[in-house]
Amino acid sequence: MAPKKTATKATAAKGNDRQKALDAALALIEKDFGKGAVMRLGDENRPPIQTISSGNTAIDIALGIGGFPRGRIVEVYGPESSGKTTVALHAIAQAQKAGGIAAFIDAEHALDPDYARKLGVDTDALLVSQPDTGEQALEIADMLVRSGAIDIIVIDSVAALTPKAEIEGEMGDSHVGLQARLMSQALRKMTGALYNSGTTAIFINQLREKIGVMFGSPETTTGGKALKFYASVRCDIRRIQTLKDGQDAIGNRTRLKVVKNKVSPPFKIAEFDIMYGEGISRESSVIDLAVDNGIVKKSGSWFTYEGEQLGQGKEKVRLSLKENPELTDELEDKIFKKLGVGKYAAASDELTDDPVELVPNVDFDDEADTEADAED
């Protein structure tokens, strides 16, 4: 019996010594690197993930936390004219409405100020850079992030971040993996600065097709593998339908799939309408989600909310909600509350989402391995 007690005491003493050593190490780390340099994952003092709303209810719900995460990298990619820049501009508009400062790195030299203004962007306050080289673009982005004053920065697009050596070289010169190395170096530098400043960085990316793929999707994104690894959220956006008023096309039905999400369960899907000259229709998404969640009743073509008829036909109800933003806010708040998203996330103890069957259909091989990729 005595040997067993002795062993127990020895184990306890050893445990106390280890705890004292750990406490001393933590105190030294805190002294050298500041409070919060090391913390326990379950510590209640650990700040929750802050967000910047996308400006659309369906996208905020698909992201799982009510918007794009602050201090993280987000990649938005898809085919041409699918709505990538529109999504980013709406996020900028929301950040500005909340009193934040936004920056736009226009590497494609294609930003339309009039369109941005229609989406709600304060173009007078928006910081815009049209760099000559990829190095210049990423250096400007890094300096803005490290200032600590920027809430959101958009880089449009990764494919247009042309290395200086390629610009100064001759047509036909081979520059294998140059852009991939540039992105890898820049993201290594920016990741920590983004977290410390709470800045959201949205990288817009294009699709390419790999040559000779026999099985699976030949699609891949530009800029190598670094962005795929460093991004906390990756969104695949596609047009799925043209919206028409009679014979006239008035917009696109668009699907956004969250193919990677480090802050919430991934593979969620959002469908929304992008109206020409107007941007993403918030009201249309609110109507769809309110009906799906039983908040608004639909009987035939009539929509009813709390016993009061909203109108006949989705388009009329959409226009009615646009003229009554208070009602739109009320419906959106009830949707978030029922689904436990955004400020209601802490009150939701269990997942209410149906099992997700869709999976990413993009092959993520490094473009740096095959610079012979064919453009769309």
Curated annotation (Swiss-Prot):
Region (Disordered): 355-376
One MF term in the entry's GO annotations: ATP binding
Binding site for ATP: 78-85
Biased composition annotated in UniProt, kind: Acidic residues: 363-376
A cellular component term, taken from the record's GO annotations: cytosol
Keywords: ATP-binding, Cytoplasm, DNA damage, DNA recombination, DNA repair, DNA-binding, Nucleotide-binding, SOS response
Keyword presence, Zinc: no
Subcellular locations according to the entry: Cytoplasm
Top-level taxon: Bacteria
GO biological process: DNA recombination; DNA repair; SOS response
Family, similarity comment: Belongs to the RecA family.
Function: Can catalyze the hydrolysis of ATP in the presence of single-stranded DNA, the ATP-dependent uptake of single-stranded DNA by duplex DNA, and the ATP-dependent hybridization of homologous single-stranded DNAs. It interacts with LexA causing its activation and leading to its autocatalytic cleavage.
Entry protein name: Protein RecA
Organism: Corynebacterium glutamicum (strain ATCC 13032 / DSM 20300 / JCM 1318 / BCRC 11384 / CCUG 27702 / LMG 3730 / NBRC 12168 / NCIMB 10025 / NRRL B-2784 / 534)
Lineage: Bacteria, Bacillati, Actinomycetota, Actinomycetes, Mycobacteriales
